[in-house]
């Protein structure tokens, strides 16, 4: 099983994932053919064992002390903890409690510890934010003063530079709800939240060939793969004989390269099917953080989700940025409106479910029998809410993939080596009200950036996040503060249109049109300050240098109209007929 690929100069290894469906299997001990239904049943037993034990490990160590020990990266002797979660848990002595009378191979216990360790490690970032919010609890949780914001930013993890304002507000609302219910502030995140679950899956990446192997099918290596994994014969295995190896055949998706190295998958059961999330490694061109000459930049919007264009950094002693004559726009009005409608329906159903749940709880407290009508209605509403949630999830996934493909395709067509975007995870339109801000927060910008970065990496294009402050405020050509109004022919103060008050400039354009030029110019002039965030594997420009930002004016691209050929001596023909004129008078006869 090969997990690494051979690389040449200028290439790096990218790990992607593809979802495959288990078709059939064969028991390697008895030679029995296993249908898909049998595979689903036996994989379900394995998933139940792993999930139950992993949840028990998470609940046992759901306290601030154990979370801090795991996040510190040091064991009791001061030695560094391994990067793999199951190794770190074993170093700390956190074992999985196997029930009496059950037999689980050591590699299955590895899977349990790996999934539990990943969940516990992922909690620490939220725990730090919650601790910072509680340590600097404001007088009014709904509105912090400037001094309170400064005190909070000083104690946030990673200098507070990458913590979105929406995350801070969510943690503040969570603590405020606890305070309202219990009359005191919580001690930490473990008091605010229940222990999280690990999900119904089996992560085989933590095991070796004693439990599972994956390889391409010998008969057709480009279309099919074979997973060999030990699955239990019964839901309560008691000996090693209850863990025979099973060869599972699956079809490799067509977008997986032929030279990609397959890695051990993650098993999931969805809608009566056994799904395999198969990671694969393949070589891609290396994306550089600096040295860019041609870039594309995009600005976020509401109905016009993305507005952007191409920018070029010229050479010479005084380099300057020129913007392309034409911009591009990704309009998703209908999709966003549909998502907004589904969100409203989901909120309405949630409110009805909460009312019915309150009524049912009230009847139980008074010793009354549950109302059959209420129970049936509650079940129907919960099913409908789940259905709408799945529709929203599918819609948002399709929107994120389409927007990512739009940006990467435009970058390829323009010959750009970098895509500049804003960090607007908590974008709010000031003075626009809660409804519009809710719609702005539901446009899956984080998923769009993730899909864009993944798709761009395959082509060696870097995706860099630029600080958003002031990109819509100043004119991209002279950096004078814009005057925003409603439309080109309506001077009333508004949002959509921007006009430069500088008489020598007078640039007038849409707000988003000016913003993407400022984003691209800021990225090109600050590209030497680009840094790689190791936690998210994202290129970031964390701070803006005022001198560079003031010099990052954008010049319009002017086509060369120099005369390159002599003037034609033959004059242009007049308005002549292409066919002979019809017989008869050329002027209409007089009336009457």
Predicted regions and their residues:
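Nucleic-acid substrate recognition interfaces
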Residues: 1-592
């Amino acid at each position: 099983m090969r997990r690494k690929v051979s690389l040449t100069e200028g290439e790096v290894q990218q790990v992607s994932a593809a979802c495959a469906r288990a078709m059939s299997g064969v028991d390697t001990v008895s030679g029995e053919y296993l249908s898909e239904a049998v595979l689903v049943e036996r994989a379900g037993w394995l998933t139940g064992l792993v999930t139950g034990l992993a949840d028990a490990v998470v609940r046992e160590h759901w306290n601030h002390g154990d979370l801090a020990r795991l996040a510190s990266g040091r064991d009791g002797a001061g030695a560094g903890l391994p990067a793999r979660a199951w190794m770190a848990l074993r170093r700390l002595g956190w074992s999985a409690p196997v029930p009496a009378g059950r037999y689980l191979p050591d590699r299955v216990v590895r899977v349990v510890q790996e999934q539990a360790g990943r969940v516990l490690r992922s909690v620490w970032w939220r725990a730090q934010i919650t601790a910072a919010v509680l340590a600097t609890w404001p007088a009014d949780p709904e509105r912090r003063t400037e001094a309170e914001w400064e005190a909070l930013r000083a104690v946030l993890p990673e200098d507070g530079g990458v913590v979105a304002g929406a995350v801070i507000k969510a943690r503040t609302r969570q603590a405020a709800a606890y305070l309202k219910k219990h009359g005191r502030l919580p001690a930490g995140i473990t008091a605010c939240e229940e222990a999280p679950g690990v999900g119904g899956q089996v992560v085989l990446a933590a095991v070796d060939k004693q439990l599972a192997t994956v390889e391409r099918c010998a008969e057709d290596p480009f279309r099919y793969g074979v997973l060999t994994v030990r699955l239990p014969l019964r839901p309560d295995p008691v000996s090693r004989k209850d863990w025979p190896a099973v060869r599972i055949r699956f079809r490799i998706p067509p977008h997986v390269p032929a030279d990609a190295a397959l890695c051990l998958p993650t098993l999931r059961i969805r809608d009566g099917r056994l799904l395999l999330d198969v990671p694969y490694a393949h070589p891609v061109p290396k994306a550089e953080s600096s040295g860019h000459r041609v870039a594309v930049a995009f600005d976020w919007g509401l109905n016009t989700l993305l507005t952007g264009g191409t920018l070029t950094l010229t050479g010479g002693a005084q380099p300057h940025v020129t913007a392309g004559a034409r911009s591009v726009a990704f309009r998703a009005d209908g999709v966003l409106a549909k998502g907004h409608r589904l969100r409203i329906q989901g909120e309405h159903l949630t409110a009805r479910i909460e009312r019915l749940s309150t009524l049912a709880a009230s009847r139980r407290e008074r010793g009354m029998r549950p109302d059959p009508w209420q129970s049936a209605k509650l079940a129907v509403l919960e099913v409908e809410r789940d259905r709408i949630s799945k529709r929203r999830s599918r819609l948002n996934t399709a929107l994120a993939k389409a927007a990512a493909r739009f940006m990467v395709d435009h970058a390829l067509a323009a010959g750009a080596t970098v895509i500049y975007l804003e960090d607007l995870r908590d974008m709010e339109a000031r003075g626009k009200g809660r409804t519009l801000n809710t719609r702005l927060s539901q446009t899956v910008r984080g998923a769009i950036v993730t899909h864009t970065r993944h798709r761009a990496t395959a082509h060696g294009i870097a995706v860099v996040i630029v600080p958003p402050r002031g990109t819509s405020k100043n004119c991209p050509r002279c950096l004078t503060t814009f005057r925003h109004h409603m439309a080109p022919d309506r001077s009333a103060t508004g949002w959509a249109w921007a006009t430069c008050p500088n008489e020598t400039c007078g640039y007038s354009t849409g707000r988003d049109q000016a913003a993407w030029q400022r984003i691209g110019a800021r990225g090109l002039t600050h590209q030497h300050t680009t840094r790689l965030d190791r936690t998210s594997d994202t290129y970031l420009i964390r701070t803006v240098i005022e001198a560079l930002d003031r010099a990052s004016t954008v010049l319009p691209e002017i086509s060369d109209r120099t005369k390159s050929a002599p003037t034609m001596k033959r004059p242009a023909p007049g308005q002549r007929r292409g066919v002979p004129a019809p017989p008869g008078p050329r002027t209409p006869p007089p009336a009457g």
